[in-house]
């Protein structure tokens, strides 16, 4: 994992996926029903837009990560398959449609993410608030996890407004190690993302915070360990690690396919550093098994508090 990251690769250079990263094409009735509902409500999902390898499994179970604020991002990260350009105006019906979808699917846990909207004064924070409020009204039993952009160069009040809307989990991904930011995530700043997550916990310590990185981009083992330490310094509760997969030949190429055993080893180290929850495998993505992971994290916090009270 010492090779430098390359910004792109030709089709002939694209590495062949090992067996452990291969998944079956989605064909189930549950998948078709989820897809139909999203179309009817004019909702976008990161599952489709980012070409997630787990879409078949998740949609079969009627789990979907709704991507608000449209399907066009104002940035062009080297790893991401979401299209870039000038976005359309914000859909005023999106909050209500998202809540209707959650209710119809009977979701116990929902993940809401978005494209970057650098064109909006608050980066789209107010739309997150509206979606959270609509979900609370329509399906109050559903726990809410949000995965936000970094709101770079936006007022601090943008993130504060989302925190005050009380999502159950606030996720913002660091994506990769600091050294690779100039080529992999050039529109963002590593320490700014850490500060965002710190600010969430500082404003409302009861909200679970979560972040993740991709592996296979040329990062070194000790760099991954340092990211873990940085996350714990920011009091992040949940860390995810998954294999980067090159969406198209225009995107950053895969430097190596990290073995399942290496992912397990990283998970052991992360748990030893004090995270309440760790998800680490080749197919791990931010919202993969998010509902189950939330329950495990909540139970881990309760056990932790019980130990403190006992002492």
From Swiss-Prot:
Cofactor note: Binds 2 [4Fe-4S] clusters per subunit. One cluster is coordinated with 3 cysteines and an exchangeable S-adenosyl-L-methionine.
Binding site for [4Fe-4S] cluster 2: 73, 77, 80
Location in the cell: Cytoplasm
GO-annotated cellular components: cytoplasm
Pathway: Protein modification; protein lipoylation via endogenous pathway; protein N(6)-(lipoyl)lysine from octanoyl-[acyl-carrier-protein]: step 2/2
Sequence positions that bind [4Fe-4S] cluster 1: 47, 52, 58, 287
Reactions this protein catalyses: [[Fe-S] cluster scaffold protein carrying a second [4Fe-4S](2+) cluster] + N(6)-octanoyl-L-lysyl-[protein] + 2 oxidized [2Fe-2S]-[ferredoxin] + 2 S-adenosyl-L-methionine + 4 H(+) = [[Fe-S] cluster scaffold protein] + N(6)-[(R)-dihydrolipoyl]-L-lysyl-[protein] + 4 Fe(3+) + 2 hydrogen sulfide + 2 5'-deoxyadenosine + 2 L-methionine + 2 reduced [2Fe-2S]-[ferredoxin]
Family label: Belongs to the radical SAM superfamily. Lipoyl synthase family.
NCBIfam families, per the entry: lipA, PRK05481.1, PRK12928.1
Identification of the protein by name: Lipoyl synthase
Organism: Sphingopyxis alaskensis (strain DSM 13593 / LMG 18877 / RB2256) (Sphingomonas alaskensis)
Record lineage: Bacteria, Pseudomonadati, Pseudomonadota, Alphaproteobacteria, Sphingomonadales
């Amino acid at each position: 994992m010492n090779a430098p990251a390359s910004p792109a690769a030709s089709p002939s250079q694209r590495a062949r996926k090992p067996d452990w990263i291969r998944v079956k094409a989605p064909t189930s009735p549950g998948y078709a029903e989820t897809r139909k509902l999203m179309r009817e409500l004019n909702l976008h999902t990161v599952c489709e837009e980012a070409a997630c390898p787990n879409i078949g499994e998740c949609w079969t179970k009627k789990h979907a990560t709704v991507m608000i604020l449209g399907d066009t991002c104002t940035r062009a990260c080297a790893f991401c398959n979401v299209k870039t350009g000038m976005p359309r105006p914000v859909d005023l019906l999106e909050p209500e449609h998202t809540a209707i979808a959650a209710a119809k699917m009977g979701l116990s846990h929902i993940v809401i993410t978005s494209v970057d909207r650098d064109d909006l004064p608050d980066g789209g924070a107010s739309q997150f608030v509206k979606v959270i409020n609509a979900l609370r009204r329509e399906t109050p039993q559903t726990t809410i996890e949000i995965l936000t952009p970094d709101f770079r160069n936006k007022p601090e009040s943008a993130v504060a407004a989302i925190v005050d809307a009380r999502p159950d989990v606030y996720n913002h991904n660091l994506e990769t190690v600091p050294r690779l930011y100039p080529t992999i995530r050039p529109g963002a700043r590593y320490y700014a993302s850490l500060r965002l997550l710190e600010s969430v916990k500082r404003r409302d310590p009861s909200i679970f915070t979560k972040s993740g990185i991709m592996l296979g981009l040329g990062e070194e083992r000790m760099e991954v360990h340092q990211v873990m330490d940085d996350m714990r310094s920011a009091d992040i509760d949940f860390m995810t690690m998954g294999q980067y997969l090159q969406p198209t030949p225009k995107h950053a190429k895969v430097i190596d396919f990290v073995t399942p055993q290496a992912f397990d080893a990283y998970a052991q180290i992360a748990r030893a550093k004090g995270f309440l929850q760790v998800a680490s495998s080749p197919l791990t993505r931010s919202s993969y098994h998010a509902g189950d992971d939330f329950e495990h994290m909540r139970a881990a916090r309760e056990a932790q508090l019980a130990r403190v009270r006992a002492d």
